[in-house]
């Protein structure tokens, strides 16, 4: 085995290409995560809230522990996450992944997880100050609608999974279309018997 020359160029990624990849990843992630803002307000506006009764200043109990409002709030979060994932997956694929490849796809999926976290934070804090104020100043026996809380934290993965699904299906569709065109060309070029 011959010794390698120290001055010989190394194969692999250069610093400028790493910076470019980091920029693509960061831009894809940030652009996708920002989509969690309207989703959070949408979840806060659409999801039903649990009815609670003030027990004393600052404390409350759930009026109906068997209420379906918990499940409905989680369902709304998951539906908004799937819709957000499908939308950002399609737009992200068309605007970034086709041109920038796997780095943009990874950024988009990381950003989708960020968007789900932003949606959760905004939705849970939507109306929280008003609820706390009412809870602190209402007499015992008053019924209030509580702020949202996601019970099924697994709902956070719906957005990134939907985005990853769209990217994978889009890439497979593009590649299979390319393969079918190549196959048709090879059949057209082959001599007929």
Predicted regions and their residues:
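Juxtamembrane non-transmembrane "cap" segments at the membrane-aqueous interface
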Residues: 51-54, 116-139
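Perimembrane loop-to-helix junctions flanking transmembrane segments
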Residues: 51-70, 138-140
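Short, Lys/Arg-rich, polar N-terminal cytosolic tail immediately upstream
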Residues: 1-18
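Cytoplasmic membrane-interface segments at the C-terminal ends of transmembrane helices
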Residues: 13-24, 48, 87-105, 124-131, ...
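Interfacial/capping segments of alpha-helical transmembrane domains
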Residues: 38-57
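Hydrophobic alpha-helical transmembrane segments
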Residues: 69-84, 142-165
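Hydrophobic alpha-helical membrane-insertion segments
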Residues: 28-44, 106-124
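Alpha-helical transmembrane segments of integral membrane proteins
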Residues: 19, 23-31, 72, 76-80, ...
């Amino acid at each position: 085995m011959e010794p390698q020359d120290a001055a010989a160029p190394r194969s692999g990624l250069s610093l400028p290409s790493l910076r470019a990849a980091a920029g693509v990843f960061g831009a894809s992630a940030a652009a996708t995560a920002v989509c969690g803002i309207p989703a959070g307000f949408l979840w806060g506006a659409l999801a039903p809230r649990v009815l609670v009764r003030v027990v004393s200043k600052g404390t409350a109990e759930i009026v109906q522990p068997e209420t379906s409002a918990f499940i409905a709030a989680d369902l709304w979060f998951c539906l908004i996450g799937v819709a957000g994932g499908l939308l950002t997956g399609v737009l992200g694929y068309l605007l970034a992944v086709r041109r920038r490849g796997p780095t943009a796809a990874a950024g988009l999926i990381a950003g989708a997880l960020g968007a789900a976290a932003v949606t959760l934070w905004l939705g849970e804090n939507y109306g929280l100050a008003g609820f706390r104020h009412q809870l602190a100043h209402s007499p015992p026996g008053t019924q209030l609608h509580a702020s949202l809380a996601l019970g099924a934290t697994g709902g956070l993965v719906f957005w990134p999974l939907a985005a990853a699904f769209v990217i994978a299906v889009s890439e497979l569709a593009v590649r299979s279309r390319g393969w079918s065109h190549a196959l048709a060309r090879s059949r057209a070029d082959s001599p007929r018997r």
